[in-house]
Amino acid sequence: MPVPKAAGNLDPVALETSLIELWNEENTFLHSIENRRERDSPFTFLEGPPTANGKPGIHHVISRLYKDMVCRWKTMEGHVVERKAGWDTHGLPVEIEVQKQLDLMSNEAIEAFGMEAFNQKCKESVWTYEQAWREMTERMGFWVDMDDPYVTLHDNYIESAWWSLKQMFDKGLLFRGHKVLPYCPQTGTSYSSHEVAQGYKEVSEPAVFIKFKLKDSIASILAWTTTPWTLPGNVGLAVGPEVTYCRVKVTAEPSSSWEGRGGAEIGEELILAKDLLGNVLRHKMEVLEEFPGSDLIGRNYEPLFPGAVDGSNSNAWTVVGADFVTTSDGTGVVHTAVMYGEDDYNLGMKEGFPAQHTVGMDGKFIEGTHEKLDGRYVKECDSDIIDLLETTGKLYREHIYTHDYPHCWRTDHPLLYYAMDSWFVKMTAVKERIIQHNSEVEWAPEWTGTKRMGEWLSNVKDWAISRERYWGTPIPVWICEKCGSEHCVGSVEEMISMKTDDSPTPPELHRPYVDDVKLNCNNDNCSGEMIREPYVMDCWFDSGCASFAQWHYPFENKEKFEGVFPVDYICEAVDQTRGWFYSLLAVSTTVFDNVAYKRCLSLGHILDKDGKKMSKSRGNVVNPWDHFNLSLIHI
């Protein structure tokens, strides 16, 4: 292939443009693959799928540069290097964009508009900037097959994802549970642990020391919380059975000025851990007695917000023992609101505390919580809750507490921890296998695998994969209304063979069409009908299936897939350690008991002028076209 010469002075832009034109005319990319077929020496690459409902940024150029360099190098060594493009087309990023366009800012508004119409808009939205991606890809000289991409919204891709979930179901790795999950009221959906890991922010907000008045004593137990909005849902206090506690009496006002609201009367008695007296108390105190936490267990106290929770026929407002109580901070006493924390929920189920919500799915206090709180967004009520506690003499003191708190990775709103039903992949059951598989991957830099991914996997949690949304791969699980039998469908053929006679054949594998399909119960002794669980999959599960779903495996291309799995090389930014890198590894471990990729290159982030990561959601992305024809972007 003759290389064109630049006339006169070197013009890099003209040279690049002429080379691209020549590659297109001679179909050089295709020939680089076909001319090496007979050598039967493949080098396999998996493209991380971007979403085409947003313009490409400079960070996409950088990642594609590293992908292209390695693939060209392997081509020059004589390998067959096929590069299939991919599109990630489901999930919240798409829904949120369409909601903004249509001014549908709640689930109720979406359902009033119509799920079918909304999902059609989502389907159209994902291709908004496809041409911009094509032009950027061609202009930078990135070789990838964009004419035959894998697309996560295609029925073939969805069917392969269904098949993988059925493998997990049959192995006992897919289960329905009621757990406390990070939840975003603005998007109306829960999140998995690896999604939450991408959205922590440092915040400064009020924390409070609260007085819980014992029923059999004049003393009050002090507890500390950084989430005042959970206090109306309090139903229990947890102490460490072997921790030493003190009962103290207030003898004088504080010697230093008092910061914030709260206080205590002279002669008032308080109970807290001995080791934390100096950290918590501001008044002068006299220690009346010391005793182990076990002496507090079983004692009852008065509710903070009478009537907010129905405590009849339960063990509500009781002190219990718990092994997670420490004296590292707080008062050595943990306030327990069953529905709003993982430890709280587990303890509540064990001790028989009432499991009742004081907060709705919209993030607002439900009617009957308190007249000054009902119907209001919880994070806006902290100050009013503190006022109410001070008015009733239940506030010892408040202070500002700075800590990292999870925020929605798409809306940037703070998440709430909320007890809810969800479908989980039991990653804890394959913990040792996924750690082993991670050690088999060649990571660059090495610490990405040994530290960042390794430490993450050492604390792996069950993966909450169901989302209470509309646009996504439907969870293929049906449950019998009559006997409760559960069935996971693994193919379109299986669904059609089991559907009731009056159920329609869905025109595509999306909501609301699959919602209309009812199945005959798989229990031979039951004549009931099975209804699909109204969830879609975590879109990270979608992309985690890319290694096999791109080939519609196992329904087609079995030999093709088996010849390229696991892939030789993937490359994305380092934040994908707990995103795509993890989901690929999690799915391949649970389905194939194997790695999904042999080598992984993780790249650092491109930062803006303020040192923050560039992202579409922040609006700080640099447009590649502002630089392509001005300078050598590769430099």
Please give the residue ranges for each predicted region:
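Conserved active-site neighborhood of enzyme catalytic/cofactor-binding cores
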Residues: T51-A85, I96, K100-L104, P182-T187, ...
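Active-site cores of enzymes that catalyze phosphoryl transfer or operate on phosphate-rich substrates
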Residues: D295-Y301, F305, W409-H413, W540, ...
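Catalytic alpha/beta core of large soluble enzyme barrels
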Residues: V80, G233-V239, V243-Y245, A264-G360, ...
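N-terminal, positively charged nucleic-acid-binding surface of large information/translation enzymes
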Residues: M1-K249, A337-K350, P354-T369, K394-I434, ...
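Extended, non-catalytic structural segments that build the interaction scaffolds
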Residues: A6-A7, A117-S125, A322-E342, H437-M453, ...
